[in-house]
């Protein structure tokens, strides 16, 4: 597994996705967020995070409404609620190239297996967040 990720897509731009994706973007990583409801706000106002670990503002964030707008990336971070996993077969393929890894930061059981059915078990990273 190659841990050198040059591009990242965050699928699920709620609290978890915006926090961890925002931290990666703050560190200088190329992060793109797949967004539904807050697209216009993020596009217009950027991202503001208030955290016990330090507040930060990203005046500009890369947001997209469809995975096709993002295109293939090195790392996909899935942070949406597991109840949306039925959409994975539509959402993941446009984000993949031959070396893409998929990290899941979701509650519940069976998430890695659902993702593995699409990308192969060798390309799945199961994660936890605090």
Model-identified regions with their sequence ranges:
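Rossmann-like NAD(P)(H) cofactor-binding subdomain of soluble oxidoreductases
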Residues: 57-130
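NAD(P)+-binding Rossmann beta1-loop-alpha1 motif at the extreme N-terminus of oxidoreductases
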Residues: 1-51
């Amino acid at each position: 597994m190659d841990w050198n990720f040059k591009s990242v897509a965050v699928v699920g731009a709620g609290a978890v996705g915006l926090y961890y994706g925002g931290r990666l973007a703050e560190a200088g990583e190329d992060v793109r967020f797949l967004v539904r409801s807050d697209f216009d706000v993020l596009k217009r106002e950027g991202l503001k995070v208030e955290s016990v670990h330090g507040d930060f503002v990203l005046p500009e964030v890369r947001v997209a409404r469809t995975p096709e707008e993002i295109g293939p990336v090195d790392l996909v971070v899935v942070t949406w609620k597991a109840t949306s996993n039925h959409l994975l077969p539509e959402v993941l393929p446009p984000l993949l190239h031959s070396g893409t890894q998929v990290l899941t930061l979701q509650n519940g059981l069976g998430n890695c297996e659902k993702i593995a059915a699409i990308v192969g078990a060798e390309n799945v990273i199961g994660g936890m967040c605090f």
